[in-house]
Amino acid sequence: MDVDASIEQVTGILVREGLRYQMSADGRTHRLLFGSAAVFIDFNEWQDDSVVITVHSPVLQDIDSASAGAAQALNMLNDLNRSFFFVKFTYREGILIARYDLLGETLQAGELVNALFEIAGAADRLDDELAEVLGGKPYEVKAEEWSGD
């Protein structure tokens, strides 16, 4: 299965499940909004003929890399990863990310929907709570900044 076929399959699942999404200008990324969180779906080639579908959400952005909050984010990764069965958390360049990887060639609708709700639930639950501890901004705050509202 190639990336284009995976994008088409995921789009079909989202439509059939009644999940509202927006597509990036290049047609390669889906964005879904859940509460104060945004969940993105990206597609990457893997090995010779496979596709990895990554469902991810920026839980917090703009964490000052030189701050105590950044150090604390790194220190919490293990606890966060142990607290959620399927979600993995990473910290990179001031962004705390929740992600879930799926294999495209065996993707089933239930798997994708579960991944979306697991990531959305984790991000929406943690964004406000961790913003106070780590600094940084939830997606909803960043989106308002970008739009100038």
Kindly give the residue locations of the regions a language model identified.
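Hydrophobic residues embedded in beta-strands of well-ordered beta-sheets
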Residues: 28-30, 51, 96
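Short, highly charged C-terminal tails/helix-capping segments
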Residues: 131-149
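Ampiphathic alpha-helical segments that act as solvent-exposed interaction surfaces
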Residues: 74-81, 108-134
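Short, basic/low-complexity N-terminal boundary segments at the transition from targeting/disordered tails
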Residues: 1-13, 61-75, 140
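A short, solvent-exposed beta-edge/loop patch
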Residues: 90-120
